[in-house]
A protein has these predicted regions:
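N-terminal signal-anchor transmembrane alpha helix
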Residues: 1-2, 65-85, 213-221
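N-terminal transmembrane-helix/juxtamembrane module of multi-pass inner/ER membrane proteins
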Residues: 1-44, 78-108, 225-229
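Hydrophobic alpha-helical transmembrane segments
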Residues: 34-51, 65, 119-124, 142
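Alpha-helical transmembrane spans of integral membrane proteins, capturing the lipid-embedded, hydrophobic core
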Residues: 37, 41, 67-72, 76, ...
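Hydrophobic transmembrane alpha-helices of multi-pass, membrane-embedded glycosylation machinery
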Residues: 46-53, 148, 170
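Membrane-water interface at transmembrane helix exits
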Residues: 48-52, 74, 78-87, 131, ...
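Interfacial segments of alpha-helical transmembrane regions
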Residues: 49-78, 140
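Membrane-embedded catalytic cores of phosphoryl/pyrophosphoryl-handling enzymes
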Residues: 102-229
């Protein structure tokens, strides 16, 4: 078993160093802003608006509470339980032997331990839970793209191995699935409204447009800051 773990860890490190090696100043700015949690407040707010316009306010409130609970469970599982237990140093940590080979942006190195990734766990948890709510919507494609790019940004910034992100995504999926179906069981009068509206949500393109606009702003801001910094 030890040999298998060491072999997987070696592959994880090699894949990380390969992916982390593609960088320049422009993308340093882009990935730093993309991974910043407050960047996506307009997207979250627009998604909430879609929920309000399609469902009764009690249903929307219950959904928001369920999403918050699922993210809290994810975050605590990753940060409070597993990271101190596993104690796998981030690749960017100066005590990690590979740190001289790691590209970091603006000297950001994160905390000491990185397994599993809280960013990946939380973003995939939110994405999967939202997918359960909106079902068969074009919004699901953007949610998957958003969570995937959020995960990749952590490799780019040098603070997580791919394995950290994979396990984080699995935790996010399991947590979102369990909380959603528990929510369905105890709030059936609310969740019965989801299936009839599957794929037919009004204003579902709003979050997509706001998300794309946010990315365009990040792209433009990254270009400006790159030029100013030269």
């Amino acid at each position: 078993m030890k040999e298998i773990i060491e072999y997987l860890s070696q592959i994880d490190t090699e894949v990380f160093l390969f992916l982390n090696g593609f960088h320049n100043t422009y993308w340093d700015y882009f990935m730093t802003m993309f991974t910043y949690r407050f960047t996506w407040v307009p997207f979250y707010a627009t998604f909430l608006y879609v929920m309000i316009r399609n469902f009764h306010y009690k249903v929307t409130t219950a959904c928001v509470v369920a999403i918050v609970v699922s993210i809290l469970i994810c975050d605590q599982t990753a940060s409070t339980l597993l990271k101190p237990m596993v104690e796998r140093m981030r690749p960017s940590n100066l005590d990690n032997p590979i740190s001289p080979l790691v590209h970091v942006a603006f000297d950001y190195r994160g905390g000491r331990y990185g397994f599993p990734s809280s960013h990946a766990a939380n973003s995939w948890c939110m994405a999967f839970f939202a997918m359960y709510l909106v079902r068969r919507s074009r919004l699901n494609i953007f949610l998957a793209f958003w969570a995937l790019t959020m995960s990749y940004s952590r490799i780019y910034l040098g603070v997580h191995y791919p394995g950290d992100l994979l396990v984080g995504a699995i935790i996010g999926f399991i947590t979102a699935t369990v909380v959603y179906y528990v929510f369905r069981y105890f709030a059936k009068e609310y969740t019965d409204q989801f299936e009839p509206k599957a794929g037919k949500l009004k204003y579902q393109h709003y979050p997509i447009l706001v998300g794309i606009a946010s990315i365009i702003v990040i792209l433009a801001a990254s270009g400006i800051m790159t030029l100013v910094g030269q």
